[in-house]
Amino acid sequence: MKFIYTNDKYEELGVLKNSSIDFEIGKYDVASNDYQMSISIGSWNREFDKGSLFYCQECEFGGILDGKKVDTSKNSITFKGKTFRGLLEKEYVQPPDGQAYYVANGEANQVIDNLIHGKFNDLFVVDNVGLSDIGVNYQIRDLNLLDALEKMLLKADIPSKLEITFYDKKVHLQAVPIVDLSELLRYDNSYGISMISEKAISKYNHIVALGKGELIERIRVNLFLQDDGTWNTSENAKYAGLKRKTYLYDNSNEEDESKLIESSIEATEKANGTDNLNINFTTDEASLFDYVGSKEEITGIEFKEQITKKVLKVTISGIISHCKFEYKVGD
């Protein structure tokens, strides 16, 4: 990988040399979506400072310089800041005046374009506006922009993810369908790679969701986990008796039953946690939010989960870069 750097006017200055960069990108509230970069003082161009860009063409890894620390004992200068994905966390989606929600309805890329319009000094652009064939219909109220985009796209008519790519001096965004790679990319010990697998403990399979009201007037919904992983009001005999595990969700301000159901499921799934897998690679084999499979032979842990975080560690000696990728699945 080759990383180009600029001045604060985004004019290219050259290729990073004699440096190391640690990136973490991924799902909102799972990944930090930031980076730390150390450069040999002798290789540092003083025009490369706060507000400058660095990036790898045709991929997501890059960011804007922010914090800076000089360590003369190590003969290095360290920069910290947000990745391009992390910059989306700097904004919140608020409802229009006089309305309870911002209603995101229509073709996905058009909606994304509307949400970022007038922000990020035109560094961010949206590709294929009106052309994705992905429809969204999602109500947003005071959500972090990255969080809102992830949730909106996941609930689209075609479950989707936000793709971020840097090229032509711009950060390009677009909605693309989530891909199930669990059969194609199914990792096990035979790969000869380092794996850490963790299976979640017994999960909640019943929700008591309480909304607005008092006593018998209070909104109350019982939801049951189904065999396909969805929730509805039909009891599932598979999770009866000792196998029943109930989560109580209490939101005394919610008067919309459909919103109560949605938020109670979200809270329960967060409380449940997910199966976890950490794998180390030297190449980038899959995209954020795609599904991959895992089987750990010693314990027999086996599951299919989304990639929710990527860590990239880059060491650049001269101009030769050595890369190590780590994937995390689950929350």
Q: Which stretches of residues belong to each language-model region?
A:
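Extracytoplasmic/secreted envelope proteins and their assembly/folding machinery
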Residues: 109-113, 146-150, 206-207, 261-265
